């Protein structure tokens, strides 16, 4: 089977930002939809929605219309959505019946679009491919029972889990099957045990800094193509002298931090270059950040915790509080 596989999308990210929603829908229309007809199946690896306990009406409406358009345009292709932790009302297993897909899509939608299948309450087995909802990988007892029930019936698993933390016992239960998972937003590869987190389909915060995001063709269990997301915003950091060689391609459609050391921030050539960049690319989200080697000299999921907290607030603060936040941080700095 030739599958188009899509990692976490998190529609409703940035406190239901409509600007972000527009970019994400554009990504689906411009980059995903043209690829679908060349595949047998389309697999969503979970967390299609972001805010598990409350889905914004406009977000739900736009995403439902997007799915309707995709499904109606590709009646011969089978679509599978695997529920992730953000797709359930609660992370507690006793609330697993409350999920985003039944709420937003509804029973009539699913009855009409017979080529859409949701793995939220039970696993789905299709052509030796086992699709496991969040609760079936994160609950060890359920996982073990499921592996034994379907033993010998699958060669490929799609799910929503953190493969890096799978125990030897858990790996052994799956046998020789390839595992491709959503949940972790950056790629993780364990070739020896055939475990792969594919990463999110979009970059969302500065935890995703300076790295691209992809969707994939997986043909009979093997990745054969990777398609870079060039539609939704990228997150970039550039340090000190690098600001003097920045081009339009480095800055357009990005959230960018110019990381300048205390020794450089007051130098005239740096001040002039920063002023030039901001005036030339006024539509870009460009911020200047003081860079200290022992705090911010590296990027990614393990970055300095105080920096991460600042960035989280910066990226998620409601718009009506943004000016107050900027004034407060200006006083502190």
Model segments located where?
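N-terminal active-site segment of His-dependent metallophosphoesterases
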Residues: 1-65, 76, 143-153, 331-333
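Active-site neighborhood of phospho(di)ester-bond hydrolases with catalytic His/Asp-centered motifs
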Residues: 6-7, 41-47, 78-85, 117-121, ...
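Accessory, non-catalytic peripheral segments of nucleic-acid enzymes
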Residues: 220-333
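Conserved catalytic scaffold of divalent metal-dependent phosphoesterases
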Residues: 81-172
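Metal-dependent catalytic neighborhoods of phosphoester/phosphodiester hydrolases
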Residues: 15-17, 46-67, 83, 88-109, ...
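Short, conserved loop/helix-junction motifs that constitute active-site signature segments
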Residues: 70-75, 150-151, 170-176, 251-252
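Active-site regions of enzymes building and remodeling cell-envelope glycoconjugates
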Residues: 115-117, 127-129, 154-155, 171-180, ...
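Conserved beta-sheet core of the metallophosphoesterase superfamily
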Residues: 163-226
